[in-house]
Amino acid sequence: MPPKDPDSSRTPESRSKSNRPRAIRRLVIWYRRNAAVTSLVDTATSSASAAGTVAGTVANSMLQPLVFDPLRWLQGNTDDEEIQEADRLWVAVDGMGGDHAPGPILEGCLEAIERLPLKIRFVGETDKVLEAADALGLSERLAQAQAADHLDLVASGPSIGMDDEATAVRRKRDASINLAMDLVKKGQALAVYSAGNSGAMMASAIFRLGRLKGIDRPAIGALFPTKDPGQPVLVLDVGANMDCKPAYLHQFALLGNIYSRDVLQVEQPRIGLLNIGEEDCKGNDLALKTHALLRDERRLHFAGNCEGRDVLSGAFDVVVCDGFTGNVLLKFLESVGSVLLGVLRAELPRGRRGKVGSAFLRSNLRRIKKRLDHAEHGGALLLGVNGVAVIGHGSSKALSVVSALRIAHSAASHGVMEDLAALQSGCD
């Protein structure tokens, strides 16, 4: 018998259904191969229409983050073209601070001056900096940055190691972290960044810049992502003070309130106290006494206790806690992005449908990782000293350095120190 025409016994509706998987596969292949940004939207729309109802549904729910959002990002990613020389601010960088310094630190600085309105005073041991630049193929970019007066190399003496005691800042007076602090103190830089020994960073900031009047202990404040991409939450302290008094947490709240208002542009920051329950009567002695102080503070909008599950909910703009608890919270969050992606990869089907689904989800997974990746929030502010100081993770790579320098620039350009000085005068 002659073979039957496969389409002769099918209704138009059944033929349309059988073509849908093929149309979806074609759509996936197209998206992978097509790099023409100018025709992305038109092509995506026509492909979705050709794929029928199923692909249309997929397009509505999936192509928004996969096509339209990346298109907007590509069209808006022109920071380097908009930089005006008059807008550039000097930032001092401890070039020898970090597990892998000075190479990744230098690379991040060179990236930052191309993306952000910054000038860098890079403090480090000159021979090691030039060797690292040569090893990473950065020598030409470094020379160009120096010629354009965007980067200035400042020679330093032996650096302070990651395992050194904080008191080493007194012995090694010409260490890179000390000289970087001096640049801020002398007004030759508006902010300082270091990914080195955090204890030495704090000690140098206190000795060289000094504490703000009325602030007993500086605090490290880190920005945590929330379910709203445009609304991070500031958590402090995340590691500077292991044992705290209620008065310290009260001061942390005042510092965080100013930063959230000035830099994050939150009109009336909601202050939360990290605790084990929402009720006023919950918590240990530290939490109970701090709660009373924050409740009676008229300069703050105290929103009550914040449970651990509410830190990333968007219900609070500033959350205060002791440094021990905050550091545990910070380190836990650093692991969330990679663990979440690993679970999703393991759970996705491995057959044909799984491959198609994975192709559609790939961009979403990357965006999730980006929002949760601690490298995207590569710096924490040291609040309470008389200058803008940003602390980076010891293992910081170039991306983390750029992120930290963005934080430094934002703090320096939004008048944070002026308002902190006003807070200081209020303590007279």
From Swiss-Prot:
One of its GO terms (biological process) is fatty acid biosynthetic process. Its EC number is 2.3.1.274. It is an enzyme of class 2 (transferase). Its main location: cytoplasm. Keywords: Cytoplasm, Lipid biosynthesis, Lipid metabolism, Phospholipid biosynthesis, Phospholipid metabolism, Transferase. Residues 1-16 have a biased composition (Basic and acidic residues). GO terms for molecular function: phosphate:acyl-[acyl carrier protein] acyltransferase activity. GO terms for cellular component: cytoplasm. Belongs to the PlsX family. This is Phosphate acyltransferase. The lineage of its organism: Bacteria, Bacillati, Cyanobacteriota, Cyanophyceae, Synechococcales. The gene is plsX.
